[in-house]
Amino acid sequence: MTIDEAIRETEVPSVVADGQGMITYVNARFEAVFGWSKDEIVGKSLTIIIPRTLHDAHHLGFSRFLVTGKPTLLGQALSLRSVTRDGREFDAEHFIVAEQRDGQWAFAATIRPLR
């Protein structure tokens, strides 16, 4: 999957973030599942959809990738928890990719709820 493919995705929630971990795009399915509108969530940190107990691990992995450029979790299905706008946590399959765009890292993920 590429970032452009994630943007075109309509059946599964998709989110795109910049190299600072700020959300730059979500699709309509993301809005429906997570309860956030694009206007509300674009510009917010990815941690808004990550359980608080996973924030440290997220920051560590994100920083490590930005320093080394070596992925450990990208390009594979990951079973992780996500958080909706109302604070409800749910299990989901995350598939995360990264690409360099104009010399900057960008990230995209599809987040398929496991219900």
Q: What is the predicted function of each stretch?
A:
Residues 23-24:
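Conserved hydrophobic beta-strand signature of PAS-family and PAS-like sensory domains
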